């Protein structure tokens, strides 16, 4: 314990110390010169002089090394912290991404439900409307039919016509109007008809009605007028029927009948028959004859299918008794009743049904035939695309026409099938065979969403897919009024985009032609190597110049103080700082919210176009900005693509060998926009084709840059795969034929294999039973620090009675390298909990781990290094969780330094000279469990092992394989120093192989002496070190203060310093620590007796036989310990006082000054601080005074602590005195005030006690805390 430090000597005393020291040295030299020879004097003087610099140099080196170690340790800690922070950030981002995905899925599901509900509601409304219209039409027809059938009985008499207008002018005008009947003229025509006498104009009126060019919507008005004619004039219906028959007979001679007129006429006569103007016999026969003529003439081409569909839709329910499938489903789904067909009997409807079904059968045959032809055309076009990369214009145009007619035929077939309540025929789709699209990926069956990590995916990983596909929807955040001007243009562009997409899809599937024509076309079709030009190149250049010129004009016209202009300029200046997805999305939203004007959009396009050529990292984010803004402002993408297209065309035309960075920037920007689908794939492939047409110099770099940017996207997209593959093969052929430079060859190969990597062998996943897969999932995936208890519960539920399951679990635990390195301790924890229920599992796992470690040393192959590291780590964790004894750990450690190592130091095949992996294994085990070898016998065992370990390390360092050119790895030195500094911070490391060997020899000699195998005479040289060893062992019993004496005083804050505070507790702790290896009782017998220095060796102990008395005793002991713990839990814990009082006789000795006449002693006492060391041997306490130099950290810290305590005492003293003085002044002022208010003399201090005046001026506690007399 440190005593009170003496005051330092004055400056005069310090100055006089060197002189006194020199005098004493000279006197000693004169006296000794008489007794010793001169040579001895010189040698001793040299030793004394040279010893001090060496010690100082060693201290400086040690301080420097420790400082470096601390700095390195600090850097490592900072690195670990940075890694942890990055991991946390990644986990947070992952969680955030998962949360966003979950929200998107929920929103999508909600939106889907809403859409389904809206669709169902819309369907219901349509069904109800259809139901209402059907009933209204049914009632109108029925009412009108009854009127027309009863017309002969209700026609007016002759005198009625005399009152009507019979003038020629009005009647001829009315007849002319009948040639242009429309629904809007119904009321006016009905009014004119009621006021005219048309009995002499019936023939003209009939001719006008038959010749009228009606629309489908005007038929009802014409039927209404015919009903009026029929109800008033008896000869109208026969005349009309005769005219219709003549009209249809004349139409038979027409080669190209008018389909619109035919459709209208057929419905017209059907409506006239339904409403009763024509009799059923006359009308139905006319309708059947005309319908049969149409169908017979159209059985092959089916050009009149629209006429039949119109007839079935408007009149099929009454004429043919048709009930459409849509009506049936609506009636069943919404419980609606549609009107029955009561106008015409079912017997008369049957011929019409048969005729229509025959027509539908022929239509389906036609559809199947066209479908087969279309499939053949698709296969032929794929062959052409695969071989040549593109289709000819004639074939392209021919297929477009054929595909359009097929789609029209398919739609008509579906409509007619619904009206006739028939099923559509099966139209199977062709599955493309591998030879159609050649070797490589299957681009026609792309992976499902979430399978982009598989071979054949468009994107390299999930992050790339999210970056290029998951864009924010500005329309969901920005008010619609901010992009209202662009809505129409956006819709037009989207429709054009859809048309273009259909054209592209049709480009893959084309046309009808014979095999001979196809072969001829394949031979004639070649890729033209002439210089190609992009369409609209001149317009693109003009747009570039126009936009760049407008910048100067706007800058001149814009007012310098414009607030919006300042905002836009600031936005464009900050745009290069948007280097991640969140920032660029925020910038897009900001621009759309605050700066969406035509002029600002042009400024943005210019800023994006003139991005610096060195900032290629900005191009993906700028392309994302353009793609994000595209739904709201499509002109940004269009203008930018046009400018890039013109710039590309300019560079290709110029053919200079400068500005390669600008060229690469342009093509890379085009590639990024292509991946966002802003730049069309056709244009991108056309750019690549232009570069391949003149494949030299900069064009090679531009082509490779373009392919490295978007080649994978183009090659793996179905619509561009074939053309891209053809262009890639052409590029490789040109590489072979053109004898390019080695740099260009490498670039071309890299670009090609980036787009189309060679097929890799797929790893076949081993199939295991479900229970084994579940065990592997628990141990290798689910197990973590948080889920250990949960996994243990699940593991306990396994069928342990099944030996196969038990063996598999043991095997999985032994194969610890399959577990994440940071989760190995969780497996040890799990095993420790599992052993309580399955005892033999722990034994088998430990045996397996030890066997694997031994096997690793025997095989010694580098591919097992990570596996061996995991096994060593697992063994250390098993000791931490008390699954193995310390003897197993030390046996393994010694095997690392001795197995396969030749005693004579010669190289061994099991441990080659350059092989340092065993050192790493030792450090791994010591880093894992070495911290628990800090006291008792395990501490001494570790100290002994470290001696042997240093010898092994120095033996490795001394081998000839390590030279100046190939030095010993510094990371191994750092790893060893880190491990030893953690375990024994005060250990003195060896500096050479000889020193390490000498330490091993000394250590072995000491133990041989203790064992009595060597006489003391043979080891006189080692007596002093043997005494030191005994002192170390004695001091281990009483405490760890010797660590302070033997090591560096700077490490005074170690936990060992606390052990000397209480001797009894220390003994108990040491006994408890010695018995930590509790798995077997024999370990206690093997430990060294702490009371005696002799070593006792015992053989195998007696086996413990369990009995009932032992179990009763253990139960009673557990009960007593539990009661004791419950009693002690209520007691207050007494904190141990670290400072032990110094005996009085030592205090008086310490207060005495240094011996007189000793200048050197005074100097030493001035530079040192006296401490008292308390030791104990047996029951006897021993005190020893230590003079610790002031340069040590221990003395400096204690001196600073004393000064701080002294300052705190002085501060409290001053504070207390100030409080007392202030209280006295307040009392005095109060007394004067009370005397002034009461002139009459009175005893005011009658109840107040007299003030106690402390002799030293201490504060009055009663006065301060007001516990004295009462105040008034």
UniProtKB/Swiss-Prot annotation:
SMART domains: MIF4G (SM00543). Residues 1-126, 370-389, 423-445, 490-517, 1018-1098, 1220-1272 are annotated as: Disordered. Residues 1027-1076 have a biased composition (Acidic residues). Residues 54-134, 487-559 form a coiled coil. SUPFAM superfamilies: ARM repeat (SSF48371). It comes from Homo sapiens (Human). GO terms for biological process: animal organ regeneration; liver development; mRNA export from nucleus; nuclear-transcribed mRNA catabolic process, nonsense-mediated decay. GO terms for cellular component: cytoplasm; cytoplasmic ribonucleoprotein granule; cytosol; exon-exon junction complex; nucleus; perinuclear region of cytoplasm. Residues 1-114, 428-439, 490-513 have a biased composition (Basic and acidic residues). Changing residue 932 to A: Does not impair RNA-binding. Residues 94-133 are annotated as: Sufficient for interaction with UPF1. Disulfide bonds: none annotated. Changing residue 1169 to E: Decreases interaction with UPF1. Residues 839-859 are annotated as: Binds to UPF3B. Changing residue 1121 to E: Decreases interaction with UPF1; does not reduce NMD efficiency. Residues 1105-1198 are annotated as: Necessary for interaction with UPF1. One of its GO terms (molecular function) is RNA binding. InterPro entries: ARM-type_fold, MIF4G-like_typ-3, Nmd2/UPF2, Upf2/Nmd2_C. Residues 1084-1272 are annotated as: Sufficient for interaction with UPF1 C-terminus. Changing residue 1173 to E: Abolishes interaction with UPF1. Changing residue 854 to D: Does not abolish interaction with UPF3B. Transmembrane segments: none annotated. Keywords: Coiled coil, Cytoplasm, Nonsense-mediated mRNA decay, Phosphoprotein, Repeat, RNA-binding. This is Regulator of nonsense transcripts 2. Found in a post-splicing messenger ribonucleoprotein (mRNP) complex. Associates with the exon junction complex (EJC). Interacts with SMG1, EST1A, UPF1, UPF3A, UPF3B, EIF4A1 and EIF1. Residues 711-928 are annotated as: Sufficient for interaction with UPF3A and UPF3B. Involved in nonsense-mediated decay (NMD) of mRNAs containing premature stop codons by associating with the nuclear exon junction complex (EJC). Recruited by UPF3B associated with the EJC core at the cytoplasmic side of the nuclear envelope and the subsequent formation of an UPF1-UPF2-UPF3 surveillance complex (including UPF1 bound to release factors at the stalled ribosome) is believed to activate NMD. In cooperation with UPF3B stimulates both ATPase and RNA helicase activities of UPF1. Binds spliced mRNA.
